[in-house]
Regions:
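Active-site-flanking structural segment that lines cofactor/substrate pockets
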Residues: 144-172
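A common structural junction motif
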Residues: 264, 367-376
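Basic/polar, acidic-poor N-terminal "presequence/leader" segments
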Residues: 57, 66, 70, 74-127, ...
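Active-site-proximal segment of RNA-dependent polymerases
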Residues: 105-108, 191-252
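Conserved polymerase palm-domain catalytic core
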Residues: 145, 225, 229-346, 351-365
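Short, conserved non-catalytic motifs in the polymerase core
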Residues: 128-136, 161-188, 201-213, 279, ...
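A structured, charge-rich N-terminal accessory region that forms the first stable segment of a protein
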Residues: 117-153
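Right-hand nucleic-acid polymerase module
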Residues: 2-9, 15-18, 24-26, 31-34, ...
């Protein structure tokens, strides 16, 4: 008996069928053939097969099927080797596999991600956020929290937690929703797995919330389109600038779900649905001054929308779902309208053409197509149609003949803020503005004017007007803030 127990192994036998998986306890083939007749006869007297031994202190995994349970004892002649492979493995239903889930259910509800993917999602989530209170609290018991989150996802017990709502006032009052840190890890987990298959189908002219496609990419892309259609500013052309009305709070979740289902399925679709249809208004904490919420227009508040509409601004999942939704619009404009010169950044889009009549026809087509297919509409107050020679204002930059400059409103705000803000915040803010101004092709004069403001406040500027330094007095006595 001791010898048989030592040679037995717990082996998972994967059935070659699309119907079920069966786990059996079988011996190694090379050692099962060496069983003696006496041992087999002794086991028969105990009423069980000589090819199976019970493993002491070994419990199978959840869902495993042990073929030794509920088996009738039958007489085995001495010297005849028996095997648990007597149970037929095939497409024919068998009693021993009745508790195993079907392949369709297993494929749909099985969480097919690794723990390494969850760890990578955690690192992606904490990037630039490690000093936040929620990230620090999660990291205090990092291993335990990650293991608990992994178990919840694997067992289907995960539920989104409380969100935080606050209001920003620059450039205009807007609601911002921040999910709990552990929920943001799940957002990154979903994003890391499914985003590549969607990005592969996106057009090259869609920007925002796509790796390598920020505001600078959008400005350069539009500038290249203008140079192409005008033959390096030698021919006239017109542009049509469109904006979607109340975009994020008007998104129909059912439309997004139907677009997601075209490329993902199973457990990942279930997780995407759970994140998509979660209503943060059911459990949230309002931070900041409550009266600021009244400054947000009612039609732009998520709290004023029906349950099936609106995505919380601030979550990675919302930005990704918005790109999935508007990819349908991109495909319609590029292939339906056959618009060759087109660029979109979130809900702002620019169409270029030689004929203003063609652009008016395209505008009418888009106005009719959006409500029917996506449940969205255009903002008529932000629709612009004029020659490109007058300048195209897009993603904070103005593209004019042979130059690209920073929007005047942004530059004037930079001068005003750096001249009035506290000294302890000036160093970081000024360098941020220098980096923003450098994105334009013609920005030397603007950077020089910003540098003059900083020099008057005691800061040193490099000769190319690309960055500022703290003055020598700010280092005395370890005081980095007082100038």
């Amino acid at each position: 008996m001791a010898q048989i127990r030592n040679v037995a192994r717990f082996v998972r036998v994967k059935a070659m069928t699309t119907v079920r998986n069966i786990d059996l306890v079988v011996p190694l083939a090379t050692q099962a053939t060496a069983m003696r007749t006496a041992d087999t006869a002794g086991l028969v007297a105990q009423g069980r097969s000589g090819a199976v031994s019970f493993l002491t202190d070994c419990s199978g995994r959840k869902g495993d099927v042990d073929s030794t349970i509920n088996r009738s004892a039958r007489q085995v002649p001495p010297g005849i080797r028996t095997s648990t492979m007597e149970t037929r493995i095939g497409t024919t239903p068998t009693t021993s596999a009745a508790l195993a889930p079907s392949a369709a259910q297993s494929a749909r509800h099985h969480a097919d991600f690794s723990f390494e993917e969850l760890i990578q999602a955690y690192f992606d989530c904490r990037r630039t956020k490690r000093n936040s209170a929620s990230a620090a609290a999660f990291e205090m018991n990092l291993e335990r929290n990650l293991c608990c989150l992994n178990d919840e996802l694997q067992e289907g017990r995960y539920r989104p937690g409380k969100s935080i709502c606050f209001v920003i006032t620059r450039p205009k009052p807007r609601e911002v929703w921040a999910a709990d840190f552990r929920d943001r890890i799940v957002h990154h987990l979903l994003y890391n797995r499914i985003s590549p298959r969607f990005y592969a189908g996106f057009i090259a002219d869609s920007c925002a919330c796509i790796p390598g496609r920020g505001t600078l990419y959008g400005a350069r892309r539009l500038e290249a389109k203008i140079l192409s259609i005008t033959q390096n500013w030698s021919r006239p052309a017109h542009y049509l600038k469109l904006d979607l009305a109340n975009f994020f709070v008007s998104i129909d979740k059912h439309v997004v779900r139907s677009l997601l289902a075209k490329r993902i399925d199973g457990w990942w679709l279930d997780l995407a649905e759970q994140i998509l249809f979660h209503d943060p208004r059911s459990d949230f904490e309002l931070r900041g001054q409550p009266e600021l919420l009244l400054r947000v227009p009612r039609h732009k508040r998520l709290t004023s929308q029906p349950a099936h509409r609106g995505l919380p601004i601030g979550n990675l999942s919302s930005q990704f779902f918005a790109n999935v939704l508007l990819d349908a619009l991109d495909q319609h404009i590029k292939h339906g309208l056959r618009c060759r010169h087109y660029v979109r950044y979130v809900d702002d889009m620019v169409l270029l053409h030689e004929s203003p009549q063609w652009l008016n026809t395209a505008k009418a087509d888009i106005e009719a197509w959006l409500p029917e297919h996506l449940g969205l509409s255009l903002n008529p107050a932000k629709t612009i149609l004029q020659p490109v020679a007058r300048g195209v204002d897009f993603v904070g930059q103005v593209i004019k003949p042979w130059r690209r400059t920073t929007r005047r409103r942004t530059f004037n705000e930079a001068l005003s803020r750096t001249s009035q803000m506290p000294a302890d915040e000036l160093f970081e803010t000024a360098n941020s503005y220098f980096g923003l101004l450098r994105q334009a092709t013609h920005s030397h004069r603007d950077r020089a004017r910003l540098g003059n403001v900083l020099r008057r406040r005691g800061h040193c500027i490099d000769k190319r007007f690309t960055k500022t330094f703290r003055s020598s007095t700010s280092y005395q006595g370890g005081n980095y803030g007082n100038q």
